[in-house]
Amino acid sequence: MHHLGLTVSNLQRSLEYYKRMFGLEPEFVTTGDGEDLSRAVGVPGAKLNFAFLRLGNGTVELLQYDNDRKDTYGLRNCDVGAPHLCFDVADIDAAYQELLGKGADFYSAPVRVADGPLEGCSFAYLRDPDGLTLEIFEQAPDRPHE
């Protein structure tokens, strides 16, 4: 994977959130516009601010379009096209408590998978400031932590 792009309503707010919650620092913050960009992204008159944040071997791209747009995210996790970004953690209970202390908006406390191929793994979903779903995930104790 090269990167995962997430469209946000306020780039500065999102940069502050991802730094505060997960320690992600921008590699760069820049702007984009013009006919080539508009054609490439399928948005007439596209004008945007965006940033790349390094996450392990990949990158999270945060994009804020200045175009007429819908500023509410209406997809539920069960809706086709609904993404989520997952962060691997070594201790989910500690990560959950730390993120709660920073104001994270979790769907629930961590859940441990009882059976199947992910038996023993734990996860919890949370929302970023735009309502995009994030996840923290702890590998089962008998599986290597990546």
Where are these regions (language model features)?
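Short, solvent-exposed beta-strand edge segments and adjacent coil->beta transition regions
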Residues: 1, 48, 80-84, 121
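Short alpha-helical patches at coil-to-helix transitions and adjacent helical residues
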Residues: 1, 8-11, 89
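Short, structured motif recognition centered on aromatic/hydrophobic residues
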Residues: 1, 18, 53, 60-62, ...
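Vicinal oxygen chelate
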Residues: 6, 29, 87-146
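Core segments of cupin and vicinal oxygen chelate
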Residues: 7-57, 94, 101, 119
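A cross-kingdom feature marking solvent-exposed beta-strand/loop segments within repeated
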Residues: 31-41, 45, 67-73, 77, ...
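Acetyl-CoA-dependent GNAT
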Residues: 65-68, 138-139
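Ampipathic, surface-exposed secondary-structure segments
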Residues: 69-97
